[in-house]
Amino acid sequence: MLTVEEIKTFIDNDAASSKKSLAKVGVRYYEGEHDIKDYRVFYVDSNGELKEDKHKSNIKICHPFFTENVDQTVQYVLSSKDGFFKSDIPELQAELDAYFNDNEDFDSELADVLTGSLVKGFEHMYAYKNADDRTAFQCADSLGVVEVEARFASDKKDHILYWYVDKVDKDGKKIKRIQAWDSKETYFYRQEEDGKIELDPFEPINPKPHTIYKKGKEDVTYYESFGFIPFIRLDSCKKQHSTLRPIKALIDDYDLMSCGLSNNIQDANEVLYVVKGFEGDNLDELQYNTKTKKMVGVGDDGDVEIRTVDIPYQARQTKLELDEKNIYRFGMALNTSGLKDTNATTNLAIKAAYSLLDLKANKIEKRLKQFLRKLLKIVLAEINEINGTDYQQKDVYFAFDREIPTNEQENAQIELTDAQRKQTEITTLLNIATHLDNETLMQLICEQLDIDYNDIKDKLPEPDENTPYKAQSTIDAIMTEEESEDNSGGDVIE
């Protein structure tokens, strides 16, 4: 086991690492807390000293492009309605549905893990046994997960330290819970504020095996261990960078341009009064009369001119539009403002708009599949143990059937055209039916209706060979006999 001193050192070093610092920036931007919040306005006074201007407008508005980018990507990648775990073995598919595809808890946790991975650059999920004695999974905030390699530990074993702030007591002190995991058991610790780390006195079993349970009404407690540390990490990329990295500067520039324009409008929102021939006592009286009575007295040759200030907004507006375009481009997201909500928006235009998001989703899927394989390994081992089977990883594959919105009117027109084409082809076949045998005719009709002929051929009636042809031949024969009788001998009427 790790010593208390080791645990404190590992947690402190991890919190100060550049990796976690960058991850915290991603979290801050995802929550809409941008650098513009710290923006300050300064000026140089008459003595040449730099001072903060607290009277000038300093509007601070955050534009959460990153939040939209992440949520949009997560929902698109996980948009498949039938789940991702697939198998051609019906019994195995039923088990996979129970663990993953039809499990709302797993869907929610997987969405949280993928969100955390995109926001921070990496996120963890850990396995545990639920009340039904089945393996379940839960997202673990990676900011509180510390990976300890065996070479750095005193016991030469791999460890995972998982900490979180449990609550704040009545005195306002934060109570931190710390879990030290190894391949067999978990130690539980407690820390108040930055005080001493000590074993948690409220845990009845400490250390605790990964799983403890009882059989029926027995008073005996049994325990099991996974045999490995049940924490699995999902990385956004090889370097574990947040997806904020390529667009952070653009978002900051957009915030600055937008807030700068707001400040200009705020500072120049009132008109200037140019008063000529003023005979009042003082300017305060003039200001009061202007704002309240909407009138002012001037001399015989006096006059009042109202002047406004033109705000140079065109340059800022152009820069805002350029920044927004580049945020979506380099963030590889869908800019819905480029899609007009009209019937003229074709499926081809929609697909083109989704091209960058589709490319990003393809990259994410590769790492997501590797991650899901690790979860599958745990579940397959449990399924085989319970059912006495020998299912392998090769028996399972992943299918990400992402959904892209389409133009419903265009789809309806395509379906109508296709139906008309099929109707024309079937009519043509019926017109030449007298020249085809019944089996060939039915095969051609089934092809047009997307029906498997082999599935229905045994259900078809047993017609005489080429019935339409025989019927036509019979009719021709009757007509021939009648003509012969008409042309045979008889009385001639003159």
Residue locations for each model-derived region?
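Extended, helix-rich architectural segments
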Residues: 1-142, 492-493
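Short secondary-structure junctions and interdomain/linker hinges
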Residues: 18, 103-110, 117-124, 241, ...
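Conserved aromatic-histidine-acidic binding/catalytic patches
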Residues: 30, 42, 54-58, 62, ...
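Short amphipathic alpha-helical segments
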Residues: 88, 92-95, 102, 106-110, ...
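Extended, regular secondary-structure scaffolds
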Residues: 118-120, 124-236
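Residues in well-ordered beta-strands of folded domains
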Residues: 126, 181, 275, 399-401
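Extended, charged amphipathic alpha-helical segments
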Residues: 210-349
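C-terminal helix-loop subdomains that flank or include functional centers
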Residues: 283-296, 315, 322-494
